[in-house]
Amino acid sequence: MALVIAHRTAGALAAENSLEGIERAAFCRADWVELDVRLSRDGELVLMHDESLNRTTSGCGLVGDLSLEELKCLKLRNRDGSLDQRSKVPTLKEAVSLARELKLGLVLEMKEEGLEGLVAESVSGEDCMVTSFYHASLRELSEISCLKTGIIISALPINPVRLALEAEACAIFPRRVNARLFKEAHQQGLAVYPWTVNSREEANWILRLGADGLVTDDPCLVRVAADQPAQATGKDNCPYYPCHHFPEQDCTHCFCPLYPCKDEELGSYVRTKKGKRFWSCINCTLVHLPQVAAYLAEHPGAITSELKARQRQKQNQ
């Protein structure tokens, strides 16, 4: 079963990065809880996502400009901006102690560079992973500790697996995914934990692709999907079955080797009812053409324009 990871200590259910959020994560049967860590002025590790205090607390200014004692005087804000009179800025030590008591694993994100030594001293164990956008920091952490690490990526780079291996990480935390990422990561022994998954529909889709876990603001919502065995998308309604490019596959992890191509001639941008714009490949048939698929099999590094040229050759014959 896939892991459920409570993002920012279940930020949809309590003030983010709070002890109350950790308790809510445990109530929802999350497996791990994700914490964001920054440094106070006097060198204490505290839970805080933003560099600024303005959005999530009753204070203002920068986290690093206040001492722990000053930070402890602040109240945390809920997602709607209201102050939670019970919640104060926790230290990493307090959060780790509570998570251990509630038998929750830890995903600790270093929000700043230079925290490697303090983090290595503060946490340990197989049920703990340290993540960061600062991949060099993860390499340094690996040199001084046995902690597991994971790279965070917000876009989908050309080779995220290589980035993870270069960072000496054992996991990838991507914001965008496709099935190729899961396939290549798993071939290298890397786990994949997409973020931030906040609907059952999205959870079901990502689990079908092969996710090892889901990072979510609402672990109660996602827990239901994660408890179910992943189901293959199937081929019953696929107009391209059997797929020319992958004739022996079972469609469980069907993917396009060109995604995300963002080619206006192959797909299109569509809008949701709420007005959001996203890329859709639903009208693309390029890699399902036999001559294109054959060329791609011989030239796996081919770019979209090369394949479109093959498509036009067939049309002109």
Q: Which residues are covered by each model-predicted region?
A:
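Cysteine-centered metal-binding/redox modules
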Residues: 227-317
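Phosphate-group recognition and catalysis centered on beta-loop-alpha active-site segments
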Residues: 1-226
